[in-house]
């Protein structure tokens, strides 16, 4: 059978082992060919091919529900659920998503992009099933580091207290998240993977006791305790812990042995109550380069399938913002042992990999545990350290309470560095960094800044380190800088709450924030072609706003435009409007940013165009709003 013929996972039923293994081979081929062409997550999906096939061979997917944690593990799932012919559109505009979306397929039972959610959602579905008197299986597949997240442990704690609720948790244990897993839980699991399973009597122990003379089915309480003690000896240490939490434990199982997986899943389906299946997999399985470099091949831009090397750009690109950040922080930390770099399982993505290599004693990776990272930083700050919490904007929102309760209320000098702020492109709505301005701006004591380019980012890193009077946050985008000259040292801190005028004009005020400062300058050039001269301000800070600069300009010019790469509700434009209103400066203001809508996966350029945020589009709208008599049909 060819993989393209599978439009429903139930078609796996009845296939021979040889056929299933051939399907596994085809999945890997399609997966590799597609990611090599489009880019995307490579290693996670390659590691769960056999797991997916074996599990789906034992389920009725017209009834049963499978939830995939994180979502980027689920590419084989997509290929087995009718999306083969669309798989080439993965992560492309109007194509299939790189994560799970309920609206994309009836087999995507719960949307996933962030980690550690599957057990909670699965338990909710299981409880709803029982309340309605229905009968179907619920399976939550967690792994790729997600078990280090506190939410997953909270769900395990809850499920373990529900002995009559049938739910299966499968741990895809590949010893990795994006980077290698860290922490005691990971170390504990690794010990189990490396030891020989001693389950030789666990599965059949009860039957053996029933056959004993005199006891039979009426075991005394004393013998029951003996039986339970022997069970604990007969499973690996982690199994004993899981069983103490209320789950029946199976494993560890070879995650690339289809017959063993099928047999284990069939046995696990017979268990009444919560069951935990521990599956040991290899991230990147079947592709030599991905197995050797599991961090580098977690996700890839388009690459040469034969060599594993990225397809070179047609022209050299400036360094990425994250690389500039990591380099600058490392240089500063070399001379200041108080600086502690903190990440949540994202060393490479946030640019802290070089920091980790050079200054391991000043580096902390907490795993997928953003809440812990923030409060940990608070404790470090209390003792005079300079903690730098480096987390993607979309993931920092998971620690909102800790930012308020543990940092801002106590006014602790923690430096938050929010990578991937703004439009992120192909990762789609679960990963867009749209909301950080709004969710941080409302918190007392917080200072928020954004650089216009990579050189200003260097100065803001110094500013954040030097700011000791309270918490401070810096947002910066995914991707490459503008190519401006960088300094190796001697960076100067910026004055808090002060912007700068980049261009002077007498007709309109353009207030740019962060990445949109460069766009503001481009808009000003277009307006100038129409005889309109704009003053362009690099705001630098959204909190505190530079009202000493903005107010006189707004009063004199009488027309204000704000530009930001974030949500309009509660964002930079809202801050400007509020400040002008409070000061009774009642001038017309037009805001440009992301409206109240989700931004789907596409290239950043496509998203900007869809949102009307390209320089020509903005110039056209400014002309229409303020200078209709000068508007032309074709701008830019």
Swiss-Prot record:
Known pathway: Metabolic intermediate biosynthesis; 1-deoxy-D-xylulose 5-phosphate biosynthesis; 1-deoxy-D-xylulose 5-phosphate from D-glyceraldehyde 3-phosphate and pyruvate: step 1/1
Pfam families recorded: DXP_synthase_N, Transket_pyr, Transketolase_C
Any GO BP annotation: thiamine biosynthetic process
Catalysis performed (reactions): D-glyceraldehyde 3-phosphate + pyruvate + H(+) = 1-deoxy-D-xylulose 5-phosphate + CO2
Stretch forming the signal peptide: none
GO terms assigned for molecular function: 1-deoxy-D-xylulose-5-phosphate synthase activity; magnesium ion binding; thiamine pyrophosphate binding
Alphabetically ordered keywords of this record: Isoprene biosynthesis, Magnesium, Metal-binding, Thiamine biosynthesis, Thiamine pyrophosphate, Transferase
Entry's EC annotation: 2.2.1.7
One term under GO cellular component: cytosol
Note on how the cofactor is bound: Binds 1 Mg(2+) ion per subunit. Binds 1 thiamine pyrophosphate per subunit.
Family that this chain belongs to: Belongs to the transketolase family. DXPS subfamily.
PANTHER family noted in UniProt: 1-D-DEOXYXYLULOSE 5-PHOSPHATE SYNTHASE-RELATED, 1-DEOXY-D-XYLULOSE-5-PHOSPHATE SYNTHASE, CHLOROPLASTIC
Name recorded for this polypeptide: 1-deoxy-D-xylulose-5-phosphate synthase
The species this protein was found in: Microcystis aeruginosa (strain NIES-843 / IAM M-2473)
């Amino acid at each position: 059978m060819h993989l393209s013929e599978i439009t429903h996972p139930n078609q796996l039923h009845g296939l021979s082992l040889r056929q299933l293994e051939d399907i596994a081979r085809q999945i890997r081929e399609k997966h590799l060919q597609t990611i090599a062409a489009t880019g995307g997550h490579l290693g996670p999906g390659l590691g769960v091919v056999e797991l997916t096939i074996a599990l789906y061979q034992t389920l009725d997917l017209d009834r049963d529900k499978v939830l995939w944690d994180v979502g980027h593990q689920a590419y084989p799932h997509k290929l087995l659920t009718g999306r083969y012919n669309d798989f080439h559109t993965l992560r492309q505009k109007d194509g299939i998503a790189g994560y799970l979306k309920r609206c994309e397929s009836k087999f995507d039972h719960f949307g996933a992009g962030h980690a550690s959610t599957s057990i909670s959602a699965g338990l909710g579905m299981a409880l709803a099933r029982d309340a309605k008197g229905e009968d179907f299986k619920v399976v939550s597949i967690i792994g790729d580091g997600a078990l280090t997240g506190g939410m997953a442990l909270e769900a395990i704690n809850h499920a373990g207290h529900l002995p009559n609720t049938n739910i299966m948790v499968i741990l895809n244990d590949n010893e990795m998240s994006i980077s290698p897993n860290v922490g005691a839980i990971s170390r504990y699991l690794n010990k189990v993977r490396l030891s020989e399973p001693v389950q030789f009597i666990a599965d059949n122990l009860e039957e053996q006791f029933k056959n004993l003379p005199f006891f039979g089915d009426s075991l005394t309480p004393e013998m029951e305790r003996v039986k339970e003690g022997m069970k604990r000896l007969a499973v690996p240490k982690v199994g004993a812990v899981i069983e103490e939490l209320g789950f029946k434990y199976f494993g560890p199982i070879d995650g690339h042995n289809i017959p063993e997986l099928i047999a284990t899943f069939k046995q696990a389906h017979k268990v009444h109550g919560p069951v935990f299946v521990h599956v040991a997999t290899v991230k990147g399985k079947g592709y030599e380069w991905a197995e050797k470099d599991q961090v580098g091949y977690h996700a890839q831009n388009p690459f040469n399938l034969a060599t594993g090397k990225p397809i070179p750009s047609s022209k050299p690109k400036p360094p990425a913002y994250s690389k500039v950040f990591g380099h600058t922080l490392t240089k500063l930390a070399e001379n200041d042992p108080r600086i502690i770099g903190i990440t949540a399982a994202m060393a490479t993505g946030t640019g802290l990999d070089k920091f980790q290599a050079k200054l391991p004693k000043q580096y902390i990776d907490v795993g997928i545990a953003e809440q812990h990272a923030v409060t940990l930083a608070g404790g470090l700050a209390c003792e005079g350290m300079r903690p730098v919490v480096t987390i993607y904007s979309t993931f920092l929102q998971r620690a909102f309470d800790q930012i308020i309760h543990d940092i801002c209320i106590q006014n602790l000098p923690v430096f938050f560095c929010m990578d991937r702020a703004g439009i992120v492109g192909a990762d789609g709505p679960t990963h867009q960094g749209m909301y950080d301005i709004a969710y941080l701006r409302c918190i007392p004591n917080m200072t928020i800044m954004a650089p216009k380019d990579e050189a200003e980012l260097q100065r803001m890193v110094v500013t954040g380190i030097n700011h000791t009077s309270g918490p401070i946050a810096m947002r910066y985008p995914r991707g490459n800088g503008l190519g401006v000259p960088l300094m190796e040292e001697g960076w100067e801190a910026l004055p808090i709450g002060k912007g700068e005028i980049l261009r002077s004009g007498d007709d309109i005020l353009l207030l740019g924030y962060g990445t949109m400062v460069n766009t503001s300058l481009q808009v000003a050039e277009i307006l100038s072609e129409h005889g309109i001269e704009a003053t362009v301000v690099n705001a630098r800070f959204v909190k505190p706003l530079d009202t000493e600069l903005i107010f006189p300009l707004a009063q004199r010019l009488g027309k204000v435009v704000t530009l930001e790469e974030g949500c309009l509700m509660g964002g930079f434009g809202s801050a400007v409007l509020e400040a002008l209103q409070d000061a009774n400066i009642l001038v017309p203001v037009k805001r440009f940013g992301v409206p109240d809508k989700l931004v789907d996966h596409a290239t950043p350029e496509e998203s900007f165009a869809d949102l009307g945020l390209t320089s020509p589009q903005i110039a056209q709208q400014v002309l229409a709003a303020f200078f209709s008599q000068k508007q032309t049909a074709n701008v830019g």
